[in-house]
């Protein structure tokens, strides 16, 4: 998490983006823009811009690295898996095979106020690929 916060992957504007969405977490002050280039149902490019806490930046960085090259349907499934993981009971085991490196965020569920930080980029990504026009807010 610290590495992705200090050296975020896919940070910056995305040339030729086909959709973008803004996300804001007023409780923590996280403010992100997710940019995607979708080609024939595949995420050909994905990046993010903005500022926020270490958890939101690291989550956005890992999300973009994980989703680049994936089918949109796979991205939607990963969103559901990630969201279920961070919302699950602390004692519930984590399926590392499904989530890969994103499983490092399992500990966030012990801190309910931080769940919104971890999921902000994911909600913005899901909103962008579904075509919603409104900015995403965690409130």
Residue ranges and their predicted role:
Residues 50-57:
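Short, thiol/selenol-centered motifs that function as redox-active sites or metal-ligating centers
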Residues 1-15, 70-139:
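C-terminal binding/interaction regions
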Residues 57-58, 77:
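Alpha-helical macromolecular-interaction surfaces
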Residues 28, 55, 110-114:
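Secondary-structure capping and boundary motifs in well-ordered enzyme cores
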